[in-house]
Structure formats: C-alpha cells, structure tokens
Amino acid sequence: MSLFGSSPPNDGSAALNPAKTANSSRSTLFDNEAPTTRSGSALFADDDHDSPWDMPTPRKQRSRADLIRNLLPSGDVPESYIETFDAVVRTENRSTNGRITAGGVARTLAAAKLGADDQARIMGIIAPASASATGAGGGGDGAHGGEANSSAAAAAAAVGLGDLGRNEFNVLLALIGLVQEGEVASLDGVDERRRNLPQPKLQGLVNENVQPMLPNLSELGAKPPQRPVTPPKAPTPSPPKQQQQQQHQPPTLRKVSMEYPEDPWNAPDLHKGHNHGPLEHSTGHNGAADVPRSVANDLNGNDAVSYSTSPEVTTTSSALPGRTTSTFTTSQPPSGPSSIHNVAESIQESNGAWNYFPGSSSGGGFGEPADNAITGPFGDSGGPGQSVSGSVGGSNPNRSIGHVRSGSNVEENILVTLMPEKEGVFMFQHHNYEVSSIRRGSKVVRRYSDFVWLLDCLHKRYPFRVLPLLPPKRVAFNGNHLSNDGAFIEKRRRGLARFLNALVRHPVLGQEQLVIMFLTVPTELSVWRKQATISVQDEFTGRTLPPGLEDSLPPTLEELFARTRVGVRRSAELYISTCTIMDRLIKRSEGVAADHARMAVSLISLTETSADTYATDHNDVPLLNDGLQAMGRHLRTAQTLMEDEAKAWEEGVLEDLKRQRDALVSLRDMFDRRDRLDKDNIPFLQRRIETNEAKLQALNAKPEGMVKPGEKERVVEAIIKDKESIVTQHNRSVFVKECIRDELRFFQNTQYNVSRLTQDWAQERVKYSEMLADNWRRLLDDLEGMPLGD
C-alpha cells in the first residue's frame, strides 16, 4: 500500500531485482559505475524515474562530449600535458589540423603501459562506443601484460574513436595518470584533482620527439654585460602551502625530457665530459594563479643557477686583439635604467599562462640578460658545433613526407584564414583575415592595413633587424593595377602567414609588445591603437654600453658584413627566379593533368563507335572496348595523382622556397637600411671640440676683467655636450654591429631550411613517381586481355 494510495507500476520488478533498485536509487553527480545500465539520455547516471523533489523545469543537460571538452581547458593543465599533446601531434599526418586521431590515442595508451582492462575503462569514458566494441576482447590480458599485448590492446581500444582536440586529450592524460597512481579512472576523480592533476608516465613518447627548444646559443649571441661578480642570492622561501605541493607533486615530463634544466638552451651533448651532474629543479603548472613571482621563477628553473658575468668568465673577449678608442668613448655618462629592459619586463609579465613560445626572457636583446635569468635567446650559453632550431619565415611544421623528423622542434604556427565576407561600403570594401594561434589560444580579426601599420612600427623600433616582408596590396603591371582576383588574394593570405610566422619565431621580434598585442587583442586594432600608449623608440635608446662588448666584436666584422651582403644579394635574385620557375612547373603539371583527363574522355568516347567501326566482325569488339575503358580509368587516376602532386608542390616546396626568398630579401633590406640610418657626425664634433678647447684656453689666458660673465661656462657646456654626443653615437654604432652580427647568426640557420625543403621535395617526387608507376603497371595488367590478332 503506497502513501499516495497506489503502488508504483514497476514495484514487482524492483522486488525481484534488489540490485537494480539500489542502482536506480543512487543519484550522484559523477557516477561512472556500471555504464551499460544507464539511460542514453542521462549525462552522469541520473535517475530515469521522476522524483517529487525535481525542479519544475530541469536545466538542459549537456552531452558527455561537451563535458569532456570543457573539463580541462588548456590554461588549467601542467605544461607536460601541452608538451605531450604537441609530441603526439607531430607524429600525426598533416591533415589532422591540430587534432589527434585514433592512432595517436593508441600510441599514448601503449606508452602508458596499462593493462587491457584499464585501457578499456579509459576508452569507455572518452568514447563509450569504442569501449563497447572492444570490451569483449580486452579483459583477458590483465594489468601485467607484455608490451606487445599493451600495444595491441591500445590499438583495439582506439577503434571507432573520433579525433581528439587539446582539451579532450588533457582528460585522457589525466585518466591515465589516475590509473598509474592506483586510483579509479573516472571523470569524478579528474574533477577532484583539477588543481593537482596527476602526471602520466609515457616512456618513449615524449623523449624521442621533444628536443631542447634552442640548442647551441653560445655561438649565436652577444656576450652578456660584464659586471663584478656578486654572491648568489639566497633562495626565496616558498610558502608552506607551495612547499607541500612541491613535495607531493610527481615529476613532470619537462624534467624527463630536459636533462639539464638549468641550461635549457643547450643540447645534452654539450655537457658530456663535464664533472657536474644535472641539478634538480621543480617545475610548476603552467597556469598557476597564486604562486608569487619568485616562486614561479624557482619552479621554472630560472632562479636556481647564478650566472657570473665578470670579465674573467667572458673567455672570448680577452683573447681578441684590442681596439684603440677615443678618450671620449671610454667614459660613460650617467643614465637611467635601460628602456629596452623595461619593455622586455612588461612583455614577460603580459605573456599569460603560455609564458611565450618558444622561449621567454626578460633580457632586452640578443645578449642583454636580466638578473638571475637564463641569458637568451642569443646569450652566452651553449657550445660550438650546434645550431639554433628557430627559423626565419613560416611554414606548416607538421608537413612531413615519408617520415617524421624527430630532431625538429615544435614551432609556433600562426594560421591566417580569409574571412568569407568583405566589409565596408561600395568602392571601399576590404578583406578581413582571421589570425589564430593554437599555442596562444588566441583568435583575432585583422585587415591588410593593420599588417602595414605593424611593420611600420617595427621599422621604427628595430631598423637594424631582419624584418619579414609583407605581400603587396595589389599587383601592378606597367603602372596599371590589376584586379584582385581569387588567386591573388590566396597568395596574399599565404604571404601574411609567412610574415607573422617569421615574426613570432624571431627571438626578439616575437617578444615585442606590439606583436603580442597584434596577435591577442580581440578588439579592432584601429580602436585599440587610439586607446593604447604605443612606444616606437629605437631599441638602442637609453641603453648603456656594457664593458667589454666592443672588445668582444672581432675587428674583421665589417669585412664579414660586406662579404655576406654580396652573397645575400646574389642569392636573393636566384631564389626569386627559382620561385618563378617552380610556379611555372606547378602550372605545367596542372596542364598535363588536364590533358590526361581530355585523353580519357576521348578514349571512353571511342568505345561508343567501335561497334560501327569494326562492323565486319564483332567478336573482338568487347575486348577492345574493355581495354579502352581501362585506359581511360587509369588516365583519370594519373590525372588525380598529378593534380595532387601539383597541389603538394604549391603548398609545400613553393612555400618553403618563398620562405627562404623572404629571409634573403629581408636581410638584403636590412643592409640597405644600415647604409641610410647608421650614420654619425663624430668627425665634425671632434673638430668643434678642438675649436672650443682652443677658445677656452684663450679665455683662461685673458685677465679676469676681459672675459664676459658666463662665457667660459657656455664654452665648457658646449664641449661636454659634444663629448656626450660622441659617446652616444659611438655606443650606437657598437650596438648596431652587435645587432647585425646576431642577426647573421640567426640567419645562419636558414641553410637547414634549404636542406629540409630539398629532402621533402625529393621524397614527394619519389612518392608520386612510385604511385604513377604502380598505376601504369596495373594498367598493363588490365590491357593483357586486348585482342592482338595472333
């Protein structure tokens, strides 16, 4: 007898199955037990039966996919999660667009070395459909199966799984970490550990692909400022809560992949033969909110090592021959702190959770380190014989033909997409471009004039650096502007992408505040420019000359500049011609493919007339038509292969050639700007100083009453101002030489881009040649049945 006068309709079934009753009465938020007994409409095992305590209008429930997508955003996970995602993405095909396929998930599960049951449970949470498909065969291996069984189970568990984005992959890594720590894999457990996520151990997955960001930087940077040796600072005590978190936090993947975190810019081979071992440093989460700045530096390994910048430590400056300088240039006038250092500090604080990719430094330039920070990106660290992994220009880092290069580092890739609709009134319409960065998690809309403004600001602030090129606004022929057709707009879009990628991969320009704001400010740039205070001062303004910097520059530097300029000018012309020839080759390949299609149509049409043509004897006509149809089919296949190859050339080797061409032309333009801007009037000032000194001696020789009041002071003040101007101009010329030298060292790595593009193109030629040869071999087999009349 019920309280309301009647019994529930399923009372009998509940009495027969008390376990089912217990399960149905349970109502929790993250109930992941017995997923097969849940209703398909419930999100977290909510009761299917109505309750008198239900709200009149229940809120709209989200699907499991939406929950997993929003459970662990990129800003809330450790940096090891981000590195693992990037490592798996590098092994994927280029067509994944930053997502991980089922094959990548299978490799991740295999690297975790979990049992088949644990893998099936994790896949049941990430993708219930795949778990049900593999649950029957995955339970018999046990948790202690061998590596082969683990790989097979991982591959089986990933069957039927769709592509995973960064957020879904974060949940997968958290579930793997929970299982490895002995906890139950569930979304409930992931949500409870949101602030202290487990660190999964994926042996062989990250170490084989992740290399130091910028190996070998001692040869590539200016020497740091020479200062007296100061005793190392005592480490800042961490708060008790932070210390406890560091004690219980498992080691991150960065510690595994970087053997020497105190020297992150150098390869491990540099430290072979040294009598020191790797220091222990703890790393924190990428997006920790309550960690003080000093503690964050300790977590990143930046404050653990004290770098001495004394003259004794600078080994190269003492070995170089001395340089005679004027007495005016040996003394330094008092000046305030370096404005470049202040700008870099503001950039460092505004980088957000990512802390700038591929590396952030609070130094002002290539060789200006900050206090207790790793010199970078061109500082005095590294060893000979190594190269910087950064590059000039931009291309898709995931593009790989044949195999994945394990030695290439992950580069930030800026995507530029043409918006479908134009903006503006008639006759004044313009295209908009969506600029997105997966690494920064930003997506903004910019127009072509915004790119022009950014480049103008960079020309004023960094006139002696390699500034990338912008594509033209319109194409002109004999002074007449041609129409902006779709092909030109597409070429301009690719040129804008190369421009931005060259900026963000430059060690100094990538940290410029204007560049960061250009990529991250979501509002219209013209509105932001009116509200923001923008400084476009020269980067050398207010910067003092460090002791020993001038002596560290070799005396043959000008000869090196002149020789490099001649080679760059000739190479730029040749690369411009090479890009034009490659463009013609692509057009011809497309034309040959179209001719194959026309020939296929003609052969198929011949089959319609064969019966009438050979009406005398119809016996061999069917075999003849079969051969013609097979010929047409394989010609169509050849057409498709040729079109695909032409498209691959256009998106691959042609873009790589243009990237190299832009780097050479940018360097050529930098030398031209130096001829215009690196000028001084030091000889004139020296002659005026000599004149004023002679005048001052004459005034001193006169009696007191014969000298006008204040005349001596005016002459002395003029001499002091001229000497200070000489010192400033001389220091600027030294900074310019140092800057150009560092730019040449950074540009030196473009030779490796040439090696990669030629190897990739050769692999593409081999791949498509083999596919075409296989197509013709199959055609030959199909033509064996044609009548020969023998």
Curated annotation (Swiss-Prot):
CC terms in the record's Gene Ontology section: cytosol; endosome; membrane
Low complexity bias: start-end ranges: 241-252, 324-339, 386-400
Sequence ranges of Polar residues compositional bias: 1-10, 20-40, 297-319
Basic and acidic residues: bias regions: 269-283
Compartment annotation: Cytoplasm; Membrane
GO biological process: protein targeting to vacuole; retrograde transport, endosome to Golgi
Residues at which a 1,2-diacyl-sn-glycero-3-phospho-(1D-myo-inositol-3-phosphate) binds: 447, 449, 473, 492
Pfam families for the chain: PX (PF00787), Snx8_BAR_dom (PF19566)
PROSITE patterns, alphabetized: PX
Disordered: annotated segments: 1-62, 215-342, 373-406
GO molecular function: phosphatidylinositol-3-phosphate binding
InterPro entries per record: AH/BAR_dom_sf (IPR027267), PX_dom (IPR001683), PX_dom_sf (IPR036871), SNX8/Mvp1 (IPR028662), SNX8/Mvp1_PX (IPR035704), Snx8_BAR_dom (IPR045734)
Keywords linked to the UniProt accession: Cytoplasm, Membrane, Protein transport, Transport
Domain PX: 411-525
Key word Ligase present: no
Gene3D superfamilies, per the entry: Arfaptin homology (AH) domain/BAR domain, Phox-like domain
Free-text note on domains in this protein's UniProt record: The PX domain binds phosphatidylinositol 3-phosphate which is necessary for peripheral membrane localization.
Family: Belongs to the sorting nexin family.
Physiological role: Required for vacuolar protein sorting.
Protein name as catalogued: Sorting nexin mvp1
Record gene name: vsp-1
